[in-house]
Amino acid sequence: MSIRWLFPKLTPRKVARILILLALPIIALTQSQSLRHSQDDAMLHIKPYDGAALPDGFYVYQRLNEKGIAIKSITPEQDSLIVRLASPEQSIAARDVLRLSLPKVTITAQQATTPTPFWQQKLTQKQSKLG
């Protein structure tokens, strides 16, 4: 049994257009959600003092993993390491653990922020005045 009798003038091209129009808002929403999640990333910037050696990334991973601190990635960058943590709440605990484990380094906590999209700025720019 065919459903052609429900939509007699619906061609495959029109069906494709409808599907694309339905998919675009879904894609936009998922992208905005992923941007929001990436704003919550916390980073630690580990830089050795002058003359000290850069710690091994695996050693840093082991020290943090022992304390149950979830790590997204450890990336070498010039003369330093960038440690991305799974949650900002773990940033302080990770910094304390690494200060005890690595006495010859400077550890700076950074909150990764991405700029707010233009369309989102425009939506939140004007506040409605009630009353």
Swiss-Prot record:
A GO CC term assigned to this protein in UniProt: plasma membrane
Record-annotated membrane-spanning stretches: 15-31
Entry GO MF terms:
protein kinase binding
Topological region Cytoplasmic? 1-14
| Residues on Periplasmic side | 32-131
Q: Which domain of life is it from?
A: Bacteria
Q: Which residues form the signal peptide?
A: none
Is ATP-binding found in the keyword set?
no
As for membrane topology, the entry says: Single-pass membrane protein
**Major subcellular location class:** membrane
Question: Which Pfam families does the annotation name?
Answer: SecD-TM1
Checking Gene3D superfamilies in the record gives: 3.30.70.260
What keywords sit in the KW lines?
Cell inner membrane, Cell membrane, Membrane, Transmembrane, Transmembrane helix
Any idea where this protein resides?
Answer: Cell inner membrane
Q: Which family does it belong to?
A: Belongs to the MzrA family.
Q: What does this protein do?
A: Modulates the activity of the EnvZ/OmpR two-component regulatory system, probably by directly modulating EnvZ enzymatic activity and increasing stability of phosphorylated OmpR.
Quaternary structure note? Interacts with EnvZ.
* Name the record gives this protein: Modulator protein MzrA
Annotated source species: Pectobacterium carotovorum subsp. carotovorum (strain PC1)
Name of the gene: mzrA
